[in-house]
């Protein structure tokens, strides 16, 4: 079974069964994506690659941004449209082949950075249509941080910023635990040590060249 077929089968009620607290988790991810790297102005455009059921749409819309979602699974896009209607543009397309109709301010790629078979080509494509920053996450126990930073620099990106993220996806910890996890994210060497066991990196990369395309 291909990844697309898998997500077609999982699409119905995806957020409810894949996240313990979907609203809190997506809101926190949106806040981290916006805080990391260059700031976005109100009304900026966010392109969400491999968006799944577009569960990131609501937090970005609530923060005054424009959202566009793309996913290779027709089932996921159908699930997103059932919830969002025509409020945001949604499209079925492979993330490593898609090109938006115009440049976007932020390209988002969550839980999907490992999908493109040719990551260099993918990064160059994204750098060409992204004005401000690419934001993605990755598991440091699976993907090497230094290698990823090198690939970004070699394929159209300049300044790279990273920060740990420890809020769990499939558990809903009480407020004191959430506060402790947030403090751990800002604990420097201790946070980096914790990433050997749990958590992910969030990364924001600024395109090194701004093409003339509008």
Task: Go through each PLM region and give its residues.
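Conserved class I S-adenosyl-L-methionine
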Residues: 1-39, 43-52, 184
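Class I SAM-dependent methyltransferase SAM/SAH-binding core
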Residues: 53-97
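A short SAM/SAH-binding and catalytic strip from SAM-dependent methyltransferases
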Residues: 106-118
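Conserved beta-strand signature within the Rossmann-like core of class I S-adenosyl-L-methionine
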Residues: 131-139
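A C-terminal cap/extension of S-adenosyl-L-methionine-dependent methyltransferases
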Residues: 135, 150, 166-214
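Short alpha-helix
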Residues: 142-156, 170
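Conserved S-adenosyl-L-methionine
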Residues: 158-168
């Amino acid at each position: 079974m291909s990844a697309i077929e898998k997500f077609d089968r999982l699409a119905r009620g995806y957020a409810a069964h894949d996240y313990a607290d979907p609203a809190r988790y997506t809101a926190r991810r949106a806040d981290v994506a916006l805080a990391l790297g260059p700031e976005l102005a109100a009304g900026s455009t966010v392109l969400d690659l491999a968006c799944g059921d577009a569960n990131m749409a609501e937090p970005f819309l609530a923060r005054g941004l424009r959202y566009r979602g793309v996913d290779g699974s027709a089932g996921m896009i159908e699930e997103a449209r059932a919830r969002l209607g025509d409020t945001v543009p949604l499209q079925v397309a492979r993330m490593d082949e898609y090109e938006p109709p115009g440049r976007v301010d932020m390209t988002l790629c969550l839980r999907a950075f490992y999908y493109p078979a040719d990551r260099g080509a993918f990064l160059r494509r994204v750098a060409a249509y992204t004005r401000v920053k690419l934001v993605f996450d990755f598991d440091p126990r699976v993907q090497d941080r230094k290698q990823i930073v090198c690939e970004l620099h070699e394929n159209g990106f300049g300044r790279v910023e990273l920060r740990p993220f420890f809020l769990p996806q499939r558990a809903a910890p009480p407020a004191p635990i959430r506060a402790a996890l947030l403090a751990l994210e800002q604990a420097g060497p201790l946070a980096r040590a914790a990433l050997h066991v749990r958590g992910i990196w969030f990364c924001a990369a600024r395109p090194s060249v701004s093409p003339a395309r509008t």
